[in-house]
């Protein structure tokens, strides 16, 4: 039988497993919120550790916290930051919308670990109290939003942006490799005028580059922190200068330019910066969906599709059709993009629900944002390494499609007029003949004139 210790809160005593650092409120949450399997993201756990350490340092600097207690909190919080106490954060996403249970989970874990470091008895709340000391100058209402911003900014900066830059570099390499290959363009999924395969891939590279810039533009908002607003934004029970000092400490811990939000009422009641930042992530998903779709369609075949690209063959594709290989990386990426679209819909609605002085959809917003970041970062790397870098052009198929395209007639329009050029294309399509046969046979141009004008290599840029 598991040994327990007695923890207490304002509701009275409750038993907690002896080897767990959490306390009464986290234990009650385990019983009260048996909902789903989605746990608080470890990025949030780390961020809560950062907040607790920064708050202890700020409170000591402002003369509010006994240095002996503060130093123990700093050490215990560092273990949270380093991931050494992850197993002691068992709570699910689906809890109070302010994240109070998770904030108290952090307070209790840091308190009990600090007590242990000081040689005290876990659960005694002495000499380190979870509320009076670990949560000093804080409220869940400003702590969890601060942790959200820290976690989301860290993961965007350290995971998503590097992954997108990795993809961008690979696409740029394909732009150079394919620059000499002229192919038929397609608009409305129908034949259009020529371009190079490199030009086509340059569009993909530009989409990713623009996505990176858009996401970076949203970081200043994510780097504004609610800490110091306490319960409703007034800063009640926090000393003058605490908000600025704690933001300074968080910036020092993370190496990211976090600052104190200029208006704490907005920082608690609205999370527009989260919605805005995820909007850029959502736009990135839209871009990646388009890129993955184009690549898998251009690689369709191998004999009965467009067949302009040869995609890497990573695994068998069918349990019934021998030899079949599928564009699995494209399919995985597009599924991720769909999930991000759904996350954005939920996050947008949640962001609109700041009733009066507090938004109470915080855990949902944090979970969806962080899931989008992780999925897109992982998928971008997987797509790059297992698909993009190995893409090859099937130049024979590309040339065959170019040679039989009727849209090369566009080059004749300035010479013989739009209507005549249209007649040539329609007649050639109806009769199954070539543009040359109809243009020369119809007396519109001579063979020499046709050769001088209908040259795909001269049609890939301004005249």
Curated annotation (Swiss-Prot):
Domain of life: Bacteria
E.C. numbers: 4.2.1.2
Keywords: Cytoplasm, Lyase, Tricarboxylic acid cycle
Important for catalytic activity (site feature) positions: 331
One GO CC term on file: cytoplasm
UniProt-annotated location(s): Cytoplasm
Function: Involved in the TCA cycle. Catalyzes the stereospecific interconversion of fumarate to L-malate.
Identification of the protein by name: Fumarate hydratase class II
Lineage: Bacteria, Pseudomonadati, Pseudomonadota, Alphaproteobacteria, Hyphomicrobiales
Gene: fumC
């Amino acid at each position: 039988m598991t040994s327990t210790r007695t923890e207490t809160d304002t509701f009275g005593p409750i038993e907690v497993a002896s080897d767990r650092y959490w306390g009464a409120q986290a234990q009650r949450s385990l019983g009260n919120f048996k909902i789903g399997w989605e746990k608080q993201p470890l990025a949030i756990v780390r961020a809560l550790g950062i907040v607790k350490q920064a708050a202890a340092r700020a409170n000591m600097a402002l003369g509010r916290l006994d240095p002996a207690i503060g130093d123990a909190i700093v050490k215990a919080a560092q273990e949270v930051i380093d991931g050494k106490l992850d197993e002691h954060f068992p709570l699910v996403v689906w809890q109070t919308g302010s994240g109070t249970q998770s904030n108290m989970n952090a307070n209790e874990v840091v308190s009990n670990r600090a007590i242990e470091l000081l040689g005290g008895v876990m659960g005694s709340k002495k000499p380190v109290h979870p509320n009076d000391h670990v949560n000093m100058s804080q409220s869940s209402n400003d702590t969890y939003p601060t942790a959200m911003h820290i976690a989301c900014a860290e993961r965007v900066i350290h995971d998503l942006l590097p992954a997108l830059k990795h993809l961008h570099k690979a696409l740029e390499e394909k732009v150079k490799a394919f620059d000499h290959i002229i192919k038929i363009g397609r608009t409305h999924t129908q034949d259009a005028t020529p371009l190079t395969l490199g030009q086509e891939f340059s569009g993909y590279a530009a989409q990713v580059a623009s996505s990176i810039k858009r996401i970076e533009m949203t970081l200043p908002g994510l780097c504004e922190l609610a800490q110091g607003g306490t319960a409703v934004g007034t800063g009640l029970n926090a000393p003058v200068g605490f908000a600025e000092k704690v933001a300074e400490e968080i910036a020092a811990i993370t190496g990211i330019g976090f600052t104190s939000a200029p208006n704490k009422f907005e920082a608690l009641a609205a999370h527009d910066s989260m919605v805005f930042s995820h909007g850029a992530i959502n736009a990135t998903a839209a871009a990646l969906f388009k890129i993955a779709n184009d690549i898998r369609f251009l690689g369709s075949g191998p004999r009965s599709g467009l067949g302009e690209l040869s995609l890497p063959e990573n695994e068998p594709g069918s349990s019934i059709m021998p030899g079949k290989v599928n564009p699995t990386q494209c399919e995985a990426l597009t599924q991720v993009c769909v999930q991000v679209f759904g996350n954005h819909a939920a996050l947008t609605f949640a962001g609109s629900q700041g009733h009066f002085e507090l938004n109470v959809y915080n855990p949902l917003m944090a979970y969806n944002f962080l899931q989008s970041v992780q999925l897109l970062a992982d998928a971008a790397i997987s797509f790059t390494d297992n698909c993009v870098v190995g893409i090859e052009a099937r130049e024979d198929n590309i040339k065959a499609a170019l040679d039989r395209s009727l849209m090369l007639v566009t080059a004749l329009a300035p010479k013989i007029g739009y209507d005549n050029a249209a007649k040539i294309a329609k007649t050639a399509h109806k009769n199954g003949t070539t543009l040359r046969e109809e243009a020369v046979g119809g007396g519109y141009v001579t063979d020499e004139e046709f050769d001088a004008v209908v040259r795909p290599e001269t049609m890939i840029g301004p005249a």
